[in-house]
Amino acid sequence: YTTLFRSVGFSGQMHGLVPLDRQGQPVRKAIIWCDARSVDEVEDIRRLLGNERLGEITCNQIAAGFQTASLLWMKKHEPALYEKTETVLLPKDYLRYRLTGCLSTDVTDAAGTLALNVRQAAWSDELIRTLGLRRSLYPKIYLPQDFAGEVTAAASAETGLKAGTKVFHGGADQVMQAIGNGIIAPGQ
């Protein structure tokens, strides 16, 4: 059946942390959204930025398990792994990277990291700098419908998907669910 696919898009869980080294290999196991180890880092973020400023930048409430809080936890508790990290991805972005070699994210998933200036649809240099993180860790941001690449020969051998199959960025699970339910305009 995999030869019938003309393209692949992704919808995946938000907020997780998949840190990659220079060779694109994970430096540790992923920390997903429901992992609450970063509760102290959440308080650090609130202390450094304040809830009001954080809300102005991210349009989000903060919780343990969000990528930025998990990254701060890693920096504090696993400094050697943090230093080896060259790029941070979200879980679905890691899967797309494995299929295509494209290190990137989409704006809907980036909005759940607590590092995105949502109004500008760009990484918040202010937030990243204030928290003492490296801006270079964050990948390029695309729209969900943007082309990411094609399934590589290596990914084809692992998955059975035909090499050359087009892959699109896709989006965060809650956003894609809303679109699937027809919620596409204000007030719906």
Model features per residue range: what roles?
Residues 1-4:
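Short, small-residue-biased leader/transition segments that mark boundaries at the very start
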Residues 12-14:
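Short, small/polar residue-rich loop motifs at catalytic or cofactor-binding pockets
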